[in-house]
Amino acid sequence: VLAGTVVLTACGGGDKAETTAAATTAAAAETTAEETTAAETAAEETTEAEEKTEGTAELRIGQVEAAAHGDKCFAIVTAVIDNNDTIVASYIDEYQFLSTNETGIPNSESFAESGAVAADKVLASKRVNDAYYSEMMKKAGSTKNIAENFNEIQNYADGKTITELEELSGKTPEEVVDAVSSATLVDTQGYVAAIVDAAKAAQENDAVVYEGDVDSLSLKRIEAAAHGDKCFTVAAALTDGTNVVLSYLDEYQFLTTNEVGVPNSESFAESGAVAEGKVLASKRANDAYYSEMMKKAGSTKNIAENFDGIQSFVNGKAIEELEAFSGKTPEEVVDAVSSATLADTQGYIAAIVEAAKQ
């Protein structure tokens, strides 16, 4: 039994799916509270309309990189919103250069061998290295692990509108920590702001219509080596436990300083963690540059367009159905996913599946 139904739509960023047309705004609902016959009738009609659309939501996903906490790390934040700009789900992780005793992101060894990263350093996910990083936090007086803090901030943001979260930007960091009482990070305000930015990015992306209980959906994310050893992939999946409802792909590679690096790239170079002349860069953020290199190799689609094509293929499919692609050849998978032309399409699908199964 499927937990819900995903209906793929052609609506772009900012458009509204037809299935949501019966929904009314909170402002409209408030105006029906007047004690007149006409207002009471309108209130009844509003209730009926809401009942008709109950369990149906238009969902979009977006992702950003941010400098939410100082200059020694950067965050990657993902957010899913509905047609009312409410955060349905969010996900925070942060990446910092640590010693090689800790667990680095995929292809860390290759990054060191190429000279892009210092030999004694690895770029590491704070969630993956939760125990190590949280021990350092404990010495500084923290009472909660870093992963637990990230989860608490996510829980606070989920269910709130973009506008509601933006109101925190006018408060002091201390006031925000007090407001998000379940989290103890002094830079809580920065993480909430990053969720807002990810949600705004989602507004520009295409939507799917989900017919089911959105409260049952979970947003999960992993790092993977989906394409060779010169980069690493971040794959996100919104799932109801059976299907991939929405997905998001981006990939990060060390490029020259002529390109757009992740936040705090200058600090990473100054510390010696990253080689001079190099920046870690999002392929989506550097779509034009990276796609020009692909074009020289014979590609007919930009990298972002390819990622979007894979996402569109995956969205709405059962996890079990997607797992079957692991038994096919890379060429067969490329043929099946006609919306993408990447030779490693199979690897990207596998990364989304792995995220969904977390």
Question: Which functions belong to the PLM regions below?
Answer:
Residues 11-21:
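Bacterial lipoprotein signal-peptidase II cleavage site
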Residues 3-4, 50, 242, 276:
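Low-complexity, intrinsically disordered short peptide segments enriched in small/polar/basic residues
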Residues 55-61, 65-219, 226-358:
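Active-site- and interface-proximal helix/loop "cap" or "latch" segments in soluble metabolic
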Residues 6-10:
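C-terminal motif of bacterial Sec signal peptides marking the signal peptidase cleavage site
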Residues 19-51:
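Extracellular mucin-like PTS domains
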Residues 1-3, 13:
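Sec-dependent N-terminal signal peptides
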